[in-house]
């Protein structure tokens, strides 16, 4: 275990997702049993005491791979030299808040964090945004970090991707490992489009295996898209452990690469592929290698899928317009 520690910065580290995420990172879930991790944890001042308690628990686990922990409320200190930044902390939507209020509140957070990353992060920085509205928060951070290559920013749609795999596996009676090439298009919101028309179940086309368009339209798509709300309804709190798990999955795929026979979903900067306007951060099917992603090209998009992709893309364009008018990008 001679490799130098990967410096992983996590924002909102004392929150619910952070509480699940930090122990996964420290135990080696990200890069395996041979790469030590240094955690750099950012929180707002009032949450630092709670974060100290979490660090006590991390200490008490005596994780062999955890080489150090630094906590604080100053992004420039916490992001200094970071190789991976997981931006989990975000302002939740409160009672009476309009979406524009939410965009504005988070805009201030992600503007400041983008600027700090731009100044002090390591040259090989990768930035994953989990805090919602994730796509547009990633766009704001990216825009405020002009010296970091734009392809180094991604927003999390891996949770939706994992949810879609789970639903399809249950429907077809196979293991989740038998599902390949699932795709989430668009925004991490209720307009997202979980697309199984290119997915495979044990090597066969998923839509043909399911052979039930009504199930796809009336159950599969809305169940995946509205799963977060269903969990809040059942649990009385938002999905935290599954979001943390997906955050680890996404970062691991990004850093270590995708298998030759599969792809993953990541919200990344559009190059105009599949009719998604350039400059939006939208979810696509991507392959990864050596820490870089590539949008899967050449997939046929039928009329049904086209309408769904256009709808979620329009929402992303509206969000970009709103934050542009707020002067955030």
Curated annotation (Swiss-Prot):
GO function terms (MF aspect): L-malate dehydrogenase (NAD+) activity
Keywords: NAD, Oxidoreductase, Tricarboxylic acid cycle
Keyword Oxidoreductase carried by entry: yes
This enzyme's EC code(s): 1.1.1.37
InterPro entries for the chain: L-lactate/malate_DH, Lactate/malate_DH_C, Lactate/malate_DH_N, Lactate_DH/Glyco_Ohase_4_C, Malate_DH_AS, Malate_DH_type2, NAD(P)-bd_dom_sf
Family according to the record: Belongs to the LDH/MDH superfamily. MDH type 2 family.
Protein name: Malate dehydrogenase
């Amino acid at each position: 275990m001679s490799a130098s520690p990967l410096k992983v910065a996590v924002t909102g580290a004392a929150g619910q997702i952070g509480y699940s995420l930090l122990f996964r990172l420290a135990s080696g879930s990200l890069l395996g049993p041979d790469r030590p991790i240094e955690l750099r944890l950012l929180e707002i001042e009032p949450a630092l005491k709670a974060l100290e308690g979490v660090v006590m628990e991390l200490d008490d686990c005596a994780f062999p791979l955890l080489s150090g922990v630094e906590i604080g409320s100053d992004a420039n200190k916490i992001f200094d030299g970071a190789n991976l930044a997981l931006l989990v902390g975000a302002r939740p939507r409160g009672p009476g808040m309009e979406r524009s209020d939410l965009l504005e509140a988070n805009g201030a957070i992600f503007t400041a964090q983008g600027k700090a990353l731009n100044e002090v992060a390591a040259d090989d920085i990768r930035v994953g945004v989990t805090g919602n509205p994730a796509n547009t928060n990633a766009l704001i951070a990216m825009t405020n970090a002009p010296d970091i290559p734009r392809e180094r920013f991604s927003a999390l749609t891996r949770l939706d991707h994992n949810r879609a795999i789970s639903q399809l596996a249950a429907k077809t009676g196979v293991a989740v490992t038998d599902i390949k090439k699932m795709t989430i298009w668009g925004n991490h919101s209720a307009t997202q489009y979980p697309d199984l028309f290119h997915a495979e179940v044990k090597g066969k086309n998923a839509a043909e295996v399911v052979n039930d368009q009504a199930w796809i339209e009336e159950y599969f798509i809305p169940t995946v898209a509205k799963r977060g709300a269903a969990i809040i309804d059942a649990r009385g709190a938002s999905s935290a452990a599954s979001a943390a798990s997906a955050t680890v999955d996404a970062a691991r795929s990004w850093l270590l690469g995708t298998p030759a026979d599969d792809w993953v979903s990541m919200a990344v900067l559009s190059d105009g592929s599949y009719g998604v306007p350039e400059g939006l951060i939208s979810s696509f099917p991507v392959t990864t290698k050596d820490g870089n992603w590539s949008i899967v090209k050449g997939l046929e998009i039928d009329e049904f899928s086209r309408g769904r992709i256009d709808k979620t893309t329009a929402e992303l364009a509206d969000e970009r317009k709103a934050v542009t008018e707020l002067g955030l990008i």
